Curated annotation (Swiss-Prot):
Residues 1-206 are annotated as: DHBP synthase. This is 3,4-dihydroxy-2-butanone 4-phosphate synthase. It is an enzyme of class 4 (lyase). Residues 207-339 are annotated as: GTP cyclohydrolase II-like. Keywords: Lyase, Magnesium, Manganese, Metal-binding, Riboflavin biosynthesis. The keyword Manganese applies.
Amino acid sequence: MKFVSVEQAIKDLQAGKMLVMVDAEDRENEGDLIFPAQFSTQEKVNFMIKEARGVVCVALDETLAKKFELPLMVPKNTSNHETAFTITVDAKDATTGVSAYERNMTIQIFADDNAKASDFVRPGHINPLIAKKGGVLERTGHTEGTVDLCKLAGLKGACVICEIVKDNGDMARREDLEIFCQKHDLNMIAVSDLIEYRLKHESLIKLEEKSQSVLAGFKAEKFIFSDHNQTQHIAFCFKDIKKCENVKFHISGSDFELLTSDKFSKLLEQIKFLSENGGVIVFMQGEKSSTTQYKNYGIGAQILRYFGIEEIKLLSQSCDKDYIGLEGFGLNLKACNFN
């Protein structure tokens, strides 16, 4: 079974149909049953609970999350993929909030222009999720993918999503998802196709400055980029970048932490390697989590695309965990190692 185009997926959502969205094989490799919150019905919610069997959530853009005063569930997110769960909610007029009827009642509030935060009680039985502002170009998750797709369809930035679980309780994978879609006459879309679609029409980065520079004693060309959050990221290029495949991503954290660990000497080794063999090191501004290896390199991937890089050899020893969904950005990961 083939994935449908983004254009077809948009038409399906506009018609109020349900879809299955699949993320990357190197991420969760799972599928979510989705539909726009504004087209929610008791029947759809019941189908989701009965057939998909996962946790019913509502993916929201930041604007709606702020409107409904939904704080994150925990101040420090230590989950594998850093999904931005907020506190749970129920409709104020619900009783237990568990039934498909009352969950639908809760979901419809998210799509109501006149609704307000006080229309919810907390905690509840619907799990709101906050999508990153940059969508799939910032984070390659179901949360961002579903909100992006709703917005591309001209709908509100609120989408009902639920993981698809098999009869035996295991998570449904690609082959299982194809069977599920055929059984229920549903189309399936890939997050990677959505990334590719958005990249053809927009970008989250802008080149602010370009100059000759020196990094750790080695001559390099310096590029300063700003993203959609006005955060700056810096790339240092060695030799002819278009002919190079060697890439290093570095999350800029505490200078003190770097200088007092063995990471500093390793970083210097990598910079020396790049200066001798050619390549690029991208310093990404952001908080580096010590509790999870998962990072979202959407911005970094766009910087590489700016340089025309398509095939990369990453200077890293943990590609299986750290670099998720790069293929959606048109990047072919050829190798990943640095001893």
